[in-house]
A protein has these predicted regions:
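Short loop->beta-strand "edge-of-pocket" segments that line small-molecule binding or catalytic clefts
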Residues: 1-2, 71, 79-100, 192
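Secondary-structure junction motif
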Residues: 88-111, 177-178, 185, 195-198
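A local structural motif
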Residues: 22-30, 108-117
Length: 200
């Protein structure tokens, strides 16, 4: 199994734990990778299953939509969306697909470039910096649910649609000839993926 760190941290422990309760002899090999790298691993059959956070080009009959999360502007103090170009942002490294999504939203919404005050290596560190008042962040809603004291505003495109990130399970059909991968896929499909979130 391969997954981005946010999914590995917030969803996989409970998901894999429940599956192992049903099939105690199951062993897992879990790799942390950005969604684009998960796609490469799944394409080369380097993994049985991949969890990805983007709408990559993958066969419809070899993927399952698990959940959809909104992307929000988040800060430790109250703010309005129109304040963002004048506020300091905590930015983070992410895969190119998501970066393009965020940049596209920003440029359709504001004329000025964002003021980057701090750059960190990942989403979790960005969240902690925001929590401690170092600036605002643009974060997926699943990261901020455990911090109700933070102020958040969902990002919306000019056409009124919310900025979202979908979570997919991807696989290759030929691996379903093996019993355990087939059972695991059925388990994930039959489950409420959001129930595996860490703070639920």
């Amino acid at each position: 199994i391969a997954a981005p760190s946010i999914l590995a941290r917030y969803f996989l422990p409970k998901l894999l734990g429940r599956f192992q309760d049903m099939y105690p002899k199951t062993k897992f090999d879990v790799q942390i990778a950005q969604s684009s790298d998960v796609i490469s691993l799944a394409s080369s059959l380097g993994i049985h299953f991949g969890f990805v956070r983007n709408d990559f080009d993958w066969r419809e009959d070899e993927r399952v939509l698990l959940t959809t999360n909104h992307v929000c502007a988040v800060a430790a103090q109250p703010f309005k969306l129109e304040d963002l170009p004048h506020m300091v942002r905590v930015d983070y490294d992410t895969d190119q697909y998501y970066q393009n999504l965020l940049d596209g939203w920003w440029h359709e919404t504001f004329e000025d470039s964002p003021i980057i005050g701090t750059r960190v290596s990942n989403l979790d560190l960005c969240k902690e910096m925001v929590f401690n008042g170092l600036g605002y962040g643009i974060l997926p809603s699943i990261l901020i649910e455990e911090y109700p004291q933070l102020y958040s505003i969902p990002l919306v495109h000019k056409n009124g649609s919310k900025l979202e990130r979908k979570t997919w399970l991807i696989y290759k059909k030929e691996l379903l000839d093996l019993r355990l991968p087939k059972v695991f896929l059925e388990f994930v499909i039959d489950s409420d993926f959001d129930s595996f979130q860490r703070n639920h």
